[in-house]
From Swiss-Prot:
Gene this protein is translated from: xseB
Name of the protein in question: Exodeoxyribonuclease 7 small subunit
Keywords: Cytoplasm, Exonuclease, Hydrolase, Nuclease
GO annotation, biological process: DNA catabolic process
Family as reported in the entry's similarity comment: Belongs to the XseB family.
Amino acid sequence: MAVTSAKKNPGSPGIEELISRLEEITRNIENPETGIENSIALYEEGLAIAEQCKKRLQEARKKIEIINPELAKNWPDTARNRDLFDSEI
């Protein structure tokens, strides 16, 4: 069975693409040949992408809570999970 992706905005990148870009940004920042100004610009881009990812994960969690409240009740409510879904980046 083929897996399809439902996006609100077909022109926006999916979470997988966003995470891939974050990984690329990390590699570029870690590269000693990347200058400080470029590293700062990459860092700012990474923060913006991380915020997009966080919002999408929050939306996904809310949908799952509506679709399957029993599943949501069994999620571990650790400090890490609360930080991920409820805090500001």
